[in-house]
Amino acid sequence: MNLKKRIAVVAYKNKLGHLGSYFSSVEIIDKIYSKMGKDDIFILSSGHAALALYVCLEKYKGKDAEALFLKHGGHPHRDEENEIYCSTGSLGLGLCVALGRAVANFKRKVHVLVSDGECAEGSIWEA
């Protein structure tokens, strides 16, 4: 599956912005998902790159990227049934949730993608 092409199709059809965020994140998310264990979880802290997450969930978990976008919009909302483990959009929130989930269950790996802009948020430094 060509993830960038899928992003372009869904973004064009739904008149979405943030293409730079989608395209710069999708290969990282794809690599993480390709190495994840069955009990591992992934949290996208930079929620504005949601479409990149949705196409990876389509590739690895059989979800429909466009249906996820229509349900959640441009920022993911917590939906564990669809393997979205944190509502993101407020910068810095995802890392805090990922840290909490990792501490709560040491047997499961928690992967999180944080954007550069988030690193200026106080919650990142507190986590």
Where are these regions (language model features)?
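N-terminal capping segment at the start of a domain
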Residues: 2-16
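Cofactor-binding active-site loop characterized by glycine-rich and histidine/acidic residues
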Residues: 13, 20-127
